[in-house]
Amino acid sequence: MNDNHYDYLIVGSGLFGATFAHLAHKQGKKCLVIDKRAHLGGNIFCENIEGINVHKYGAHIFHTSNKKVWDFVNSIVEFNRYTNSPVANYKGKLYNLPFNMNTFYQMWGVTTPEEAQAKIDEQKAEAVARMKADGVTEPRNLEEQAQILIGKDIYEKLIKGYTEKQWGRKCTELPAFIIKRLPVRLIFDNNYFNDKYQGIPVGGYNKLIDGLLEGVETKTNVDFFENRSYWEGIADKIVFTGKIDEFYNYQFGKLNYRTVRFDTEVIDKPNYQGNAVVNYTEREVPYTRVIEHKHFEMFGQEVYENPKTVISKEFSTEWKDGMEPYYPVNDKQNSELYAKYKELADKEENVIFGGRLAEYKYYDMAPIIEKVMEIF
């Protein structure tokens, strides 16, 4: 066996690829990780601007209730105490997210769980009555579904505009199943996640990726598809984390995605919005949210030690060739198309498909690591 032969060629250095390489390397396997971008880390890559780790491909917050996963990532890099507590801005008024007693006080002035529940029940009943008046018993679209779950006020101010910007379609044109449930908390708790553990790697996500890939051979600026037969010939098995339809030369057609555009700017003040995440929930503001990156890793007085800050405005758009694919569009048509590719993938003996693009599935970070751990 020559020196240039590998047990695994791993296409893509995002969380799936990097975790796979780490665990395979620990078992003594010889791995090569290639990535078409100029950097490692996939979409969790951070760019350092003005001493601030900027989440180049959108905000990533690690959260899990799986102790095994939490212990694993903390064995690579220590995680900080960041807690995701977004704020919604609707026409200049601020509301806490997720929907909790703070939100209901801000919306209606109610101060007890009973008052809040009564107000929600009253608004839900009104929504059901409106549907009945139209001769409808089941919600026909997202708008009706959201209103029977949470009522008109919260829907109009905090859900409608944001959702329409995210999907590029009116809520009356979106299917009801997109919102299966809307968690309502009758407690004063702004922690977005219910998980036991959450945080951001101390020093940023690049520290996690570099730690996972320590001792593993990597090559950047390498496109697997430009020299496919060569890459396929240098390893016993391939771990593929790119787009599954591209792997099969789009033979059944192209899968659809939503993408996100980021306008990132340096601001000459230490604190722009006082929070990492502020959602803009009215339709008239073109962006969906503003991320202020320093709040992921700097707390209290630390915020003021750096006189500058970096913000990213997020714009959600329809994906076109050449754009970064972010979110799969799991409608009927795309799901059926993916099923055809999945059928081919299942027959592969020497290719492992994993991650958001290869499985055409939205993933949080922790489940990706969990999935790779199950393989080993």
Language-model features: where?
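N-terminal Rossmann-like FAD-binding beta1-loop-alpha1 element of flavoenzymes
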Residues: 6-33, 376
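C-terminal segments that line or cap access tunnels to active or ligand-binding sites in enzymes
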Residues: 235, 246-374
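Dinucleotide-binding Rossmann-like beta1-alpha1 core, especially the glycine-rich loop
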Residues: 50-125
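Short catalytic/ligand-binding loop motif for oxyanion handling, primarily in non-cytosolic enzymes
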Residues: 41-43, 88-90, 96-97, 155, ...
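Short hydrophobic core segments
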Residues: 9-11, 34, 233-245
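Active-site/ligand-binding neighborhood in enzyme catalytic cores
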Residues: 88-93, 101-235, 248
